[in-house]
């Protein structure tokens, strides 16, 4: 023990210590009261003159020694004494390698922010020092340089504000993020706000197209409209009023201390009912792009153009839903700040402060464009979630339009233009073409179709009643039609009538875009006489180029009553009283022809469920004999419609044969208007009119389907009882007041006219009966005199001459007379090439010396292009039904000749 103690004492020599302190006192002479107790003197700190290497001492273990290595500088003699900051400097120098290693690892994963900017050094503060921490401070950017506003300015500086139309700029978010030295999510925030204003548009993933500010005023105009419809101005006023009420309540007499009362929290609750236009809780509605559009709307609808941040947050973020979690609300407010920073960089808003009773509030003022008067009214495609009500209404109109077009048959679409019809002249009759309609019915402008339709309808109604009291030139059918419509009636090249009564009035009526009706009415001295019926003995003319179906009511002896209504399918506007554009009344007209139904073959109407669909006429299974003198009236689609069925039924009904097989023969009606129209109410009103006046005429107009050529006809739906009463010997002459109207695509054809008042038939050659009907009886068929079909002439009821536009065709012999009517009519097919070569075609009815009888007429079978009911089947087989069809042959005598080149 003693040896060990001696050894310890030898190592620590008190004598040496005392000598050292004496030398120190002599040299420095700065310290006072030095205690030199030998028993207590132990070296607690290293000596100043001779620094001790602690690692070489045996009594210091590694745990007791410092971790940091000793630098070479520390081995040198230090002149300054130990200070309180000496340990801090040692710690900083020891930690600096770790800081450097950590920064090097960060450089491997991301670029240094704002590394390539030239003005970084000028904006940074110089840190004095030569340590590693000073170098890091130099490289680190400030918060201002990392702000979204400054980043947006750098982003916008890369692209032109108004690029050329031919210049296409593509933005790659990855390249922009690398060049600007920021993360890609920061670029996403900028691009989303720019996309809300249509400055950019998404092309692909992380690829956007740059459009510039060309469409910015139009976009702002659209957002202003949407904001007005969303009633954002009322919501802001309501919020401000509630805040004022809350202020008065808190700082009023009841609350003097100014502390918030938890019972007043209900005044701050803005439920969903306060904002009927608030969107649902969808993630898309809360996106930055949608929120940016709504934020701009608040400025555009505000009168002061100043919006505080809290009001915008309550309206756009829907505080009532995020009230339990205030952190989410604060996050959304930060999103509003991001939007405001981008809008500030675009020079649309600037930050201001609004001073209120509670202090200053952050707000933003709109400094962008406010006058949109010079901008056209075209709406841009704003997102559907901004205004779902408007989008739903627009798309609903398009769906309804498409449904109506697809619900009806292809041939019953609106009549096409004449150019399209002429291109389909030689098409197959049974192949309806549902081609592309005109621009008014295009789905590409479905949202504007209703506006154009209303404009055309209003203008046409006004012009119809103005022209009703005007007196244009006497004998010209020149209706005034709206410019918007492409289905205008083309005026005839020559006068319509050359008769004694030359005082005519022409007016036009149009319902929607369904077609025009031009009717010359006899002139009168007063407005009361203008309501006289056009179906007089000398002027029963109705020229209807493009209507689908109408019925014309008129009395034989006197004019129509003013209460005669006129309506077309799909509209209820009034046109002059002698026209009634209504659906056919099947049941009523069938009951009036009961005496003839007994002699007819079994013909049944279609079932109830087919009444609203396009009707079809079906011939019996076995065709009639050639000696029956089947004389079908050719309708607009080139097929024959029996006058028997047309006159007896009052229309062209839909019938079935004995086996029930339905063959579409003649298109009758089309539901081109309102599909929800109730036909039963119209039938009942028509029944009352017929029972009042038995001599009332109902004219049924059957139009040809679009693209098919032929003749349109106007048949009477009602006859007096004595005109249809059959005799015991044979079927007498059947008075058919009818009008033949050509297809509207074949040029200004005339009307084949038959007077509507029954009377004696003149058998003198070269004369046309003035007061009698066009007699299609068995014995008087050949006594009918002249009929004319001419592109520029009209039948003269009182003149014995035939007006023709071409004098050399006046004496032209009939071309290949019809085998059904030898010496009666000669017809050139309008769709044939022969018709194209001859601008005027004349049909002259030759007088036979003796009345033709069924036995004296021999019929030859010829193959025709249009398979009309009269030309179906073998001629020998048709002769077998001669006797059974005697009663029905009086009305089936007209057939288009097949002599023209096919």
UniProtKB/Swiss-Prot annotation:
In-chain residues carrying the UniProt-annotated modification Phosphoserine: 96, 411, 832
Disulphide bridges: none
InterPro entries: E2F, E2F_WHTH_DNA-bd_dom, WH-like_DNA-bd_sf, WH_DNA-bd_sf
Segments of the chain annotated as binding DNA: 143-212, 283-368
Ranges annotated as biased composition (Polar residues): 884-902
Region of interest called Disordered, as start-end residue ranges on this chain: 253-283, 418-439, 589-627, 665-690, 844-902
GO BP field: chorionic trophoblast cell differentiation; DNA damage response, signal transduction by p53 class mediator; hepatocyte differentiation; negative regulation of cell population proliferation; negative regulation of cytokinesis; negative regulation of G1/S transition of mitotic cell cycle; negative regulation of transcription by RNA polymerase II; placenta development
Keyword vocabulary terms for this entry: Activator, Cell cycle, DNA damage, DNA-binding, Nucleus, Phosphoprotein, Repressor, Transcription, Transcription regulation
Organism domain of life: Eukaryota
CC per GO annotation: nuclear speck; nucleus; RNA polymerase II transcription regulator complex
Pfam families listed in its UniProt record: E2F_TDP (PF02319)
Positions with biased composition (Basic and acidic residues): 253-269, 589-611, 679-690
Subcellular location: Nucleus
Gene Ontology terms, MF aspect: cis-regulatory region sequence-specific DNA binding; DNA-binding transcription factor activity; DNA-binding transcription factor activity, RNA polymerase II-specific; DNA-binding transcription repressor activity; DNA-binding transcription repressor activity, RNA polymerase II-specific; identical protein binding; RNA polymerase II cis-regulatory region sequence-specific DNA binding; RNA polymerase II transcription regulatory region sequence-specific DNA binding
Function comment: Atypical E2F transcription factor that participates in various processes such as angiogenesis, polyploidization of specialized cells and DNA damage response. Mainly acts as a transcription repressor that binds DNA independently of DP proteins and specifically recognizes the E2 recognition site 5'-TTTC[CG]CGC-3'. Directly represses transcription of classical E2F transcription factors such as E2F1. Acts as a regulator of S-phase by recognizing and binding the E2-related site 5'-TTCCCGCC-3' and mediating repression of G1/S-regulated genes.
Entry note about domains: In contrast to classical members of the E2F transcription factor, atypical members contain 2 DNA-binding domains and regulate transcription in a DP-independent manner. Both DNA-binding domains are required for DNA-binding and are proposed to form an intramolecular structure that is similar to the winged helix structure of the E2F-DP heterodimer.
The family this protein is said to belong to: Belongs to the E2F/DP family.
Record's subunit section: Homodimer and heterodimer: mainly forms homodimers and, to a lesser extent, heterodimers with E2F8. Dimerization is important for DNA-binding. Interacts with HIF1A. Interacts with MN1.
Name by which UniProt lists this protein: Transcription factor E2F7
Organism: Rattus norvegicus (Rat)
Name of the gene encoding the protein in the UniProt record: E2f7
């Amino acid at each position: 023990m003693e040896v060990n103690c001696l050894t310890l004492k030898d190592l620590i020599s008190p004598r040496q210590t005392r000598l050292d302190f004496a030398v120190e006192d002599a040299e420095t002479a700065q310290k006072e009261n030095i205690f030199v107790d030998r028993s207590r003197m132990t070296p607690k700190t290293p000596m100043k003159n001779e620094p001790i290497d602690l690692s070489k001492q045996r009594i210091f273990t590694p745990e007791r020694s410092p971790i940091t290595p000793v630098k070479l500088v520390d081995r040198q003699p230090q002149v300054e004494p130990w200070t309180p900051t000496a340990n801090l400097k040692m710690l900083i120098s020891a930690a600096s390698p770790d800081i450097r290693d950590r920064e090097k690892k960060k450089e491997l994963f991301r670029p240094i922010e704002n590394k390539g900017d030239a003005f970084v050094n000028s904006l940074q503060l110089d840190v004095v020092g030569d340590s590693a921490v000073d170098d890091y401070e130099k490289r680190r950017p400030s918060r201002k340089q990392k702000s979204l506003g400054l980043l947006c300015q750098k982003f916008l500086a890369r692209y032109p504000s108004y690029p050329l139309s031919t210049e296409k700029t593509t933005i790659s978010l990855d390249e922009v993020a690398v060049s600007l030295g920021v993360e890609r999510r920061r670029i996403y925030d900028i691009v989303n706000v720019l996309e809300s204003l249509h400055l950019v548009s998404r092309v692909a993933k992380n690829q956007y197209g740059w459009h510039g500010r060309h469409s910015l005023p139009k976009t702002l105009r659209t957002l202003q409209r949407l904001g007005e419809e969303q009633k954002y101005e009322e919501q802001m006023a309501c919020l401000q009023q509630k805040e004022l009420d809350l202020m008065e309540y808190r700082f009023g007499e009841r609350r003097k201390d100014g502390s918030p009362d938890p019972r007043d929290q209900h005044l701050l609750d803005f439920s969903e009912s306060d904002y009927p236009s608030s969107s649902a809780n969808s993630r898309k509605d809360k996106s930055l792009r949608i929120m940016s559009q709504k934020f701009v709307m608040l400025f555009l609808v505000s009168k002061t153009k100043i919006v505080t941040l809290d009001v915008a947050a309550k309206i756009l973020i829907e505080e009532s839903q995020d009230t339990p979690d205030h952190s989410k609300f604060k996050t959304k407010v930060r999103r509003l700040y991001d939007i405001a920073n981008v809008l500030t960089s675009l020079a649309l808003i600037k930050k201001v402060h609004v001073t209120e009773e509670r202090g200053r509030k952050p707000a933003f003022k709109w400094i962008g464009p406010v006058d949109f008067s010079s901008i056209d009214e075209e709406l841009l495609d704003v997102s559907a979630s901004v205004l779902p009500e408007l989008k739903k209404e627009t798309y609903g109109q398009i769906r309804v339009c498409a449904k109506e077009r697809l619900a009806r048959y292809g041939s019953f679409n609106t009549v096409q233009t004449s150019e399209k019809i002429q291109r389909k002249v030689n098409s197959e009759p049974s192949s309806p073409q549902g081609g592309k309609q005109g621009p008014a019915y295009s789905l590409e402008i479905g949202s504007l179709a209703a506006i154009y339709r209303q404009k055309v309808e209003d203008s046409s109604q006004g012009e119809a009643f103005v022209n009703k009291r005007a007196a244009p030139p006497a004998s010209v059918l020149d209706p005034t039609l709206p410019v918007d419509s492409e289905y205008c009636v083309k005026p005839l090249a020559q006068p319509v009538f050359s008769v004694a009564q030359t005082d005519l009035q022409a007016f036009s009526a149009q319902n929607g875009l369904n077609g025009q009706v031009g009717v010359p009415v006899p002139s009168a001295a007063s407005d009361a006489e203008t309501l006289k019926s056009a179906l007089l003995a000398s002027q029963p003319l109705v020229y209807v180029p493009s209507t689908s179906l109408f019925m014309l009511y008129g009395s034989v002896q006197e004019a129509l009553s003013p209460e005669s209504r006129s309506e077309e399918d799909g509209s209820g506007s009034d046109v002059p009283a002698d026209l009634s554009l209504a659906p056919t009344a099947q049941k009523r007209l069938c009951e009036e022809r009961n005496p003839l139904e007994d002699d007819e073959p079994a013909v049944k109407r279609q079932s109830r469920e087919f009444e609203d669909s396009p009707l079809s006429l079906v011939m019996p299974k076995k065709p009639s004999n050639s000696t029956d003198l089947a004389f079908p009236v050719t309708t607009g689609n080139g097929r024959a419609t029996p006058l028997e069925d047309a006159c007896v039924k009052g229309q062209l009904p839909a019938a079935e044969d004995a086996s029930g097989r339905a063959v579409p023969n003649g298109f009758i009606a089309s539901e081109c208007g309102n599909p929800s129209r109730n036909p039963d109410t119209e039938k009942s009103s028509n029944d009352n009119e017929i029972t009042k006046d038995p001599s009332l005429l109902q004219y049924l107009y059957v139009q040809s389907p679009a693209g098919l050529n032929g003749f349109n006809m106007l048949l009477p739906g009602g006859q007096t009882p004595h005109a249809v009463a059959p005799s015991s010997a044979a079927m007498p002459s059947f008075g058919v007041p009818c009008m033949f109207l050509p297809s509207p695509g074949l040029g200004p054809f005339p009307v084949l006219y038959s007077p509507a008042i029954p009377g004696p038939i003149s058998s003198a050659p070269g004369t046309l009966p003035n007061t009698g009907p066009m007699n299609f009886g068995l014995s008087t068929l050949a006594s009918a005199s002249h009929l004319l079909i001419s592109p520029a002439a009209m039948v003269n009821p009182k003149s014995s001459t035939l007006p023709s536009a071409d004098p050399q065709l006046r004496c032209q012999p009939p071309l290949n007379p019809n085998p059904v009517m030898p010496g009666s009519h000669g017809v050139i097919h309008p769709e044939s090439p022969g018709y194209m070569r001859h601008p005027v075609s004349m049909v002259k009815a030759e007088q036979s010396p003796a009345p033709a009888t069924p036995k004296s007429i021999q019929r030859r079978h010829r193959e025709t292009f249009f398979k009309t009911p009269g030309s179906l089947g073998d001629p020998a087989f048709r002769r077998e039904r001669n006797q059974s069809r005697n009663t029905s042959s009086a009305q089936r005598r007209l057939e288009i000749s097949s002599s023209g080149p096919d």
